[in-house]
Amino acid sequence: MERIDGVAVGLCAHSPYLRPFTLHYRQDGVQKSWDFMKTHDSVTILMFNSSRRSLVLVKQFRPAVYAGEVERHFPGSLTAVNQDQPQELQQALPGSAGVMVELCAGIVDQPGLSLEEAACKEAWEECGYRLVPTDLRRVATYMSGVGLTSSRQTMFYAEVTDAQRGGPGGGLAEEGELIEVIHLNLDDAQAFADNPDIPKTLGVIYAISWFFSQVVPHLSLQ
């Protein structure tokens, strides 16, 4: 997962996942404009494996995070790209710079698929757990990336067991996914969320906090 080489950067001319726009508007009589991206809505799912007394998370390489870390360490690395020809980065970082711990998640891009069905699909593809929509509890729906996008993300929770794990997970190779499934012991979860040295998403921190607030008081952890 962390063996990354041959990194080159070019301008994005077309993407099925995002599209840039500029919104022009007048606010209190003042003419303004704002750049934004149209992106897909998404779902995340926090799973608690009661057989292992652990939270099910995923770890994967995120190219955008990696590129941002390269620019942060070597300012100007992304400014000289050519739209016609991607340029290899002259200075790079180890692949670990782009690896994140996250919730199982995915974009909602299939017409006719409910949010619950999309979450079940991701639970199987990424983590190997078989779920049906009735297994899910909706935690929250919120806006993500409000300065740049208008996408909504919906978080679900499900309690699972080892018996529901029928596959290895790992994501879909044909979609470029390479995912490691993590079973985080409950005894370590809060320290994990509080540790600033472990690269993780805000969703993981929120989900763990929600779990200990809303679920743990009602669990039998004997």
From Swiss-Prot:
PROSITE patterns: NUDIX. Its main location: cytoplasm. The keyword Magnesium applies. The keyword Ubl conjugation does not apply. Its cofactor is Mg(2+). It is found in: Cytoplasm. A motif (Nudix box) lies at residues 111-129. One of its GO terms (cellular component) is cytoplasm. Keywords: Cytoplasm, Hydrolase, Magnesium. Signal peptide: none annotated. It catalyses: UDP-sugar + H2O = UMP + alpha-D-aldose 1-phosphate. Pfam families: NUDIX. GO terms for molecular function: ADP-ribose diphosphatase activity; identical protein binding; metal ion binding; UDP-sugar diphosphatase activity. It comes from the Eukaryota. Residues 38-206 form the Nudix hydrolase domain. Belongs to the Nudix hydrolase family. Hydrolyzes UDP-glucose to glucose 1-phosphate and UMP and ADP-ribose to ribose 5-phosphate and AMP. The physiological substrate is probably UDP-glucose. Poor activity on other substrates such as ADP-glucose, CDP-glucose, GDP-glucose and GDP-mannose. PANTHER family: UDP/ADP-SUGAR PYROPHOSPHATASE (PTHR11839), URIDINE DIPHOSPHATE GLUCOSE PYROPHOSPHATASE NUDT14 (PTHR11839:SF15). Homodimer. This is Uridine diphosphate glucose pyrophosphatase NUDT14. The lineage of its organism: Eukaryota, Metazoa, Chordata, Craniata, Vertebrata.
